[in-house]
Amino acid sequence: MDETAKARGAQQFEEYWARQMADPAFAAVYAEEAAKKELWLQLVEARQAAGLTQAEVAERLGVSQAQVSRIEKRGYDAYTLNTLRRYVQALGDDFRLEVNVIQQARPLPV
């Protein structure tokens, strides 16, 4: 494939992606999936940076290694704040929740 064809393909993809992201429903699903991936990566990378295995974290939490594996599973989204707090503290870190409001809040229907 020559460079012109590659550039044309890249431009077509960018146009396609812009159309997809213009759809609020698609953009919402994409944002949710991206947030899950980001959380998953942060948990795994934090454990690895702490030099701990899943088994060691499990021991500190008083749960099975399988439960830690489930927490670290990509796409898992049944976290509670307490689970996240305990997990991060088991790594020897402080838990901090940051909320970024991307769109203006809308009133909820009554």
Predicted regions located by residue number:
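N-terminal flexible/basic segments that precede or flank functional cores
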Residues: 1-38, 102-110
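Recognition helix of helix-turn-helix/homeodomain-like DNA-binding domains
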Residues: 61-77
